[in-house]
Structures are given as structure tokens and as C-alpha cells.
């Protein structure tokens, strides 16, 4: 029994056991089965093969050789006999070439050229006609090119194709158009000795900036600024702290945002106190000059009106709930709250006879003064002139 057959039978039994039990057999199970004899025989063959005394596994023939029925090539070495005659010399020259037989599917046979022995052989040249004549350029060529009866090509026996001579000043040549340097296509490489406005300055090239993935989003100018700040050559001053006024404004903004979130009314603004100083005259003298003239400034109005508006807005809900209730036909109904007045209330009064008479007397006052003094002076002018008297 061959070792390959034993191995295939053992593998087939192991696969069948694994399909049945779901696992490979253990050594105890192998010994309990009749397949143990084949295991023992397989190990015996393996030991004999490793020692080199037992039967060896035959090598597998390649597919190419098996398909062509390849057989080892046999070479036949024949020693040529000495032949003196002319016909015999021709036959020897033919036998020196290897006869190659067309390979068939059944067998391949090759005949090797005669081996060269180390012992020198006698030359088989009896007459000088056996030597191959060298071609001579003086031999005339006939209609069919041939040299000593051997057909040659048209160019054989010649020295070669003549080489074209280079143009010399004496020879006539076609004039070549001279290309001017200014008409050449400019190259992309700029001149090194020309100061270009687009080139990077040298002091920027000397600065080594390690760009991190976060700093790649920054501009080039920002990266240069950071490198200058971090360099020990020049230290920039730290950022200035905010002034108290700016800190107060930030605090007020935060407080307003908190009030909006809580639903509280906005914080009332405090009136600004401005100290006004006068150069020259004192405030008392200025009051005497100006008199009782009052200048209306809308920004000087008190803030109390704004506070009242805030309280009224906050109490609108309570006022609506506390509105009086009226009874109509035994059904209680709450009075609807109307819109708040947006215009100033005007009081219309009817003039009496006494007011009309006093108005007529005031109109006639200017006429009487004009007749007595010769000047037209009304009551308003008199009051304004009396203020500037000392």
C-alpha cells in the first residue's frame, strides 16, 4: 500500500468523524478504532522515508509533460570520418549542422552536433579551391549581382553609404533666419538680481513659524504677529484693563439682560449731574442780567414721570381685576377698561362780560399813552425796560 493512499484514507476517516461528532478525534479514540493500524503503518513509512531506506513517494509528473508524453532527450554523437574527395567534403559540411526533428505528441528526439575533441584534427583542404574567396571591390558586377557564382545583394561589397558633409564657409547653404533675443518667449523664472515687489522680504524668511493645525486657519499676518509677540527680542505691553466707566456699562448691560429674563421692568436711568462753570461774571450777576427768563430744556424734565409710567404699566393687570362690578338685570358684569388718554385734556371756559371789558381797556391803553407822551409804548415794553434799570 502506498503512503499517499494511506494518508488519503486517514484524512477521509477524520473528516467523517468530525462531521458526525462535531470535533476531531482524540488519540484514545483513534487507538480504540480499527483505523489505528493504518496510523501505525503511515508512521512506519514516514520514518523509512526520512531515513532514505524505505519506499519513497514517486514524484508527480508535470501537466505539460504528461499532456505531451514527454520523454528525456537522447543525443547521438557521431565522429565524422576523414573524406578526401570533393563530394565527401560537402557531405561532411552538411552533417555538421544539427538535424532538428519536428516534435510530435508522442516523442521528441533531437540530434546534437558532433562534439569537438581537444586533439587537433587534420585540415580537410587538399586544393586551394576549398577556401572561400574574399569579395574584392574591383570585381565587376553583372546584371544579376553575384561574386564568384554566389548571389549577393546590391549593397554588398561596397564600403557603405556615404556620409553627408557638414556645411563649410565655402559651400552654399540655405540662409537661416536670425531670431532676435527680444522676441523669445519669456520664462517663468524671475531674475535673481532684480528686486521684485512680489517676492517675500528677507527678514520674513528668517522667521521660523511652526504652524499648528489650529493656526492654519489664521491669516499670514496674524501668525507673524504672534511669532513676534512670543519672541524674546520684543515684548509687547499687556492689555490695558477697562476703565471704571466701561466696567459700569458692562455691569448695566448684564443687569438689563437679567431683568428681561425675569420679566421685571427696566432699571430707571439716573439723571446726569453736570457742573457748569462760568468764566468772567459770577452766576448772581448773570441772573440779574437774564432776569427771570426761563429756557425750556426737554432733557431737564424730572424722571418721576417715567417712574409713574412704569408703576402704571405694572398695575394694569391689578386694575383690570379690581374694576367695579355692575349689575344689569341681576347679572354681574365687569366694566371693560378703556384705552388710556393720549392727548392733553383741554378745559373750555366761556368769557364773562367783565373779562371782555377788561380786554377792551388794555387795548385802549396804548392810544392814551401815545397822545400824552408822544411815544407808542405798550405794557409789555414797559415791563421789559424796567428790568434793566439800576
Swiss-Prot record:
InterPro entries: DNA_rep_checkpnt_protein, Sld2
Biased composition (Basic and acidic residues): 353-362
Gene Ontology BP annotations: DNA replication initiation; double-strand break repair via break-induced replication; mitotic DNA replication preinitiation complex assembly
GO molecular function terms listed in the Swiss-Prot or TrEMBL record: DNA replication origin binding; single-stranded DNA binding
Keyword Cell cycle: yes
Any one GO cellular component localisation term in the record: cytoplasm
Ranges of biased composition (kind: Pro residues): 134-143
Chain intervals for the UniProt region annotation (Disordered): 46-148, 232-256, 353-372
Secretion signal, residue range per the UniProt entry: none
Biased composition (Polar residues): 363-372
Domain of life of the native organism: Eukaryota
Entry keyword Cytoplasm: yes
Similarity section: Belongs to the SLD2 family.
Protein name: DNA replication regulator SLD2
The encoding gene: SLD2
Amino acid at each position: 500500500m502506498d503512503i499517499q493512499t494511506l494518508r488519503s484514507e486517514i484524512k477521509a476517516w477524520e473528516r467523517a468523524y468530525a462531521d458526525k461528532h462535531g470535533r476531531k478525534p482524540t488519540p484514545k479514540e483513534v487507538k480504540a478504532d480499527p483505523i489505528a493500524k493504518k496510523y501505525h503503518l503511515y508512521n512506519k513509512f514516514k520514518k523509512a522515508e526520512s531515513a532514505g531506506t524505505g519506499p519513497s513517494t514517486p514524484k508527480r509528473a508535470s501537466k505539460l509533460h504528461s499532456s505531451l508524453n514527454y520523454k528525456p532527450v537522447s543525443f547521438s554523437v557521431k565522429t565524422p570520418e576523414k573524406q578526401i574527395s570533393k563530394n565527401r567534403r560537402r557531405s561532411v559540411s552538411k552533417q555538421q549542422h544539427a538535424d532538428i526533428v519536428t516534435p510530435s505528441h508522442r516523442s521528441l528526439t533531437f540530434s546534437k552536433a558532433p562534439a569537438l575533441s581537444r586533439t587537433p584534427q587534420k585540415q580537410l583542404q587538399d586544393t586551394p579551391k576549398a577556401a572561400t574567396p574574399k569579395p574584392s571591390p574591383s570585381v565587376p558586377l553583372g546584371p544579376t549581382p553575384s561574386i564568384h557564382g554566389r548571389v549577393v545583394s546590391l549593397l554588398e561589397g561596397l564600403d557603405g553609404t556615404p556620409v553627408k558633409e557638414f556645411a563649410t564657409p565655402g559651400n552654399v547653404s540655405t540662409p537661416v533666419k536670425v531670431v532676435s533675443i527680444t522676441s523669445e518667449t519669456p520664462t517663468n523664472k524671475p531674475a535673481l538680481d532684480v528686486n521684485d515687489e512680489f517676492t517675500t522680504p528677507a527678514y520674513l524668511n528668517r522667521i521660523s513659524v511652526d504652524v499648528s493645525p489650529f493656526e492654519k486657519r489664521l491669516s499670514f499676518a496674524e501668525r507673524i504677529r504672534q511669532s513676534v509677540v512670543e519672541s524674546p527680542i520684543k515684548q509687547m505691553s499687556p492689555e490695558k484693563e477697562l476703565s471704571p466707566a466701561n466696567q459700569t456699562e458692562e455691569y448695566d448691560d448684564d443687569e438689563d439682560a437679567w431683568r428681561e429674563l425675569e420679566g421685571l421692568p427696566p432699571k430707571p436711568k439716573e439723571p446726569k449731574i453736570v457742573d457748569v462753570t462760568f468764566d468772567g461774571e459770577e452766576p448772581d450777576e448773570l441772573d440779574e442780567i437774564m432776569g427771570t427768563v426761563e429756557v425750556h430744556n426737554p432733557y431737564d424734565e424730572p424722571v418721576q414721570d417715567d417712574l409713574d409710567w412704569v408703576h402704571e404699566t405694572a398695575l394694569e393687570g391689578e386694575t383690570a381685576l379690581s374694576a367695579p362690578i355692575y349689575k344689569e338685570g341681576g347679572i354681574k358684569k365687569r366694566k371693560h377698561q378703556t384705552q388710556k388718554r393720549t392727548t392733553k385734556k383741554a378745559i373750555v371756559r366761556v368769557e364773562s362780560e367783565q373779562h371782555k371789558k377788561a380786554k377792551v381797556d388794555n387795548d385802549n391803553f396804548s392810544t392814551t399813552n401815545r397822545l400824552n407822551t408822544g411815544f407808542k409804548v405798550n405794557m409789555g415794553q414797559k415791563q421789559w425796560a424796567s428790568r434793566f434799570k439800576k
